[in-house]
Amino acid sequence: MISKNQLARINELSKKSKETGLSDAEKTEQKQLREEYLKAFRSSMKNTLKTVKIVDPEGNDVTPEKLKRERDQNLH
């Protein structure tokens, strides 16, 4: 999970980049922070999707088999 301080720094660097530009060190820091943020976001999204159950209008479970297998693996 990314901390509030890291998120604030990402936003600060983004704002500065639009207003005055960033130094090479700041560009490197921004890239690293964005990569950490995306990694945390993707992990969270995968965990959320593993809990989803898809049901058709008739009430039948139509969750893809791959998703069902991944969900079952996490339970054991």
From Swiss-Prot:
Gene3D superfamilies in alphabetical order: Helix hairpin bin
InterPro entries: DUF896
Protein name: UPF0291 protein BPUM_1689
Pfam family, any one: DUF896
Family: Belongs to the UPF0291 family.
Subcellular location: Cytoplasm
Keywords on record: Cytoplasm
Cystine pairs: none
GO cellular component, one term: cytoplasm
Basic and acidic residues composition-biased segments: 12-31, 63-76
Protein source organism: Bacillus pumilus (strain SAFR-032)
Lineage: superkingdom: Bacteria
